[in-house]
Amino acid sequence: MRAKLWYNGENAKYKRSFMIERKRHMLVKNGLAFVRGAFEQADVRIENGRVAEVGQLSAKAGEEIRDAQGLYVLPGFVDIHIHAFGGADCMRGEADVRRMSTGLLQTGVAAFVPTTMSAYPQQTYDALSGIQAVVDRPEAHGAAVLGAHMEAPFLALKYKGAQLGECLQAPSMAAYDEMVRGLTCVRMMTLAPELPGALEVIAALKKRGVVTCAAHTAALAADIHAAADAGLTQITHLFNAQTPLHHREPGVPGAGLADDRIVVQMIADGIHLHPDVLRVAGKCKGAQGVALISDSMEAAGLPDGQYDLGGQAVFVRDGAARLESGVLAGSTLLMHQAVRNMITLAGIAPEEVIPMATSTPADSVGAKGFGRIEPGAAGVLALMDGSWNFAGVIA
């Protein structure tokens, strides 16, 4: 099978070098590998799709050798909040989720959590069924689907953003079960914790192993801390679609930054958050407290133009996706771009940023075997150059 690589013109000079044949056994040499929180001149052996060894290694008989040409060798990225990519949207069913899986791998993503949006219960169930199908029968050469992230319907109307207001409802496990109907793929849920019944839902979902997050919410800081007491562990797209930070009422962002139990998701596209805000949040929470996300819609990886999100027209201009009203409607961000932006725009050290796109999001949803270059981990390696441009993927 030909392992095609995705390029956006940033590093066409590497294209020929990394148009590789998929091999069962491969040794990656001459790269600066991100291992145990630091960059090392280390070789990486991949066998049967998994990292087998890391260190100063000699080739085995018949083993394919790939020269990383001095590039940074990173763990494959983990995106825990992504609606769509390359014209495919997880709300449209199994075929689109499979297209997302194969396409995202070419951008360096090793694993992702397809994220639903507000819809009627049957539509939500249909979308979850498509995600479940790919969880149960993964793509042979695609990014792993870790489960579903339900970003609706238990949201506050005031902060709905691009969500469909008519599909929002009060939190209850009865409503949740009506949408899920026994499916086992749900891994995350975003809700507004100040709504009546939300704390009970958070506690119940924790018992089922579902990670809960706060966003599209009018919560005050006290509501977030109470939700964390009940089991909430993340803030979705920090500062966006939530109460603002104020010095006398810190709101959702202030509580999320202050509470060490909470991981904050950030969209590092320079549109949703100013670089100074990215820097402040990154320095406040550190590598283990930030999960970089794309929150991308179907225009990610495609040119500017008109697209769709939940039946709404979305206009993408200069990479910014907005409804006709001007409201932001997801992003067109790719994970490797988020890494570059955190380093080059926000000025956060690479050693701090890499975990934010790899091990921290993986750990935050209990995804073992992703986010690190270590024996047993997924054998997906993202390559970036000294200017933090994406150079290719080895998988």
Where are these regions (language model features)?
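Histidine-rich, glycine-flanked metal-binding segment
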Residues: Y7, I20-L74
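Metal-associated gating/positioning segment near the N- to mid-region
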Residues: L71-D126
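Active-site core of metal-dependent hydrolases
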Residues: D177, R181-L302
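Short acidic/histidine-rich active-site segments
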Residues: Q288-G310, F315-T332, P375-G376
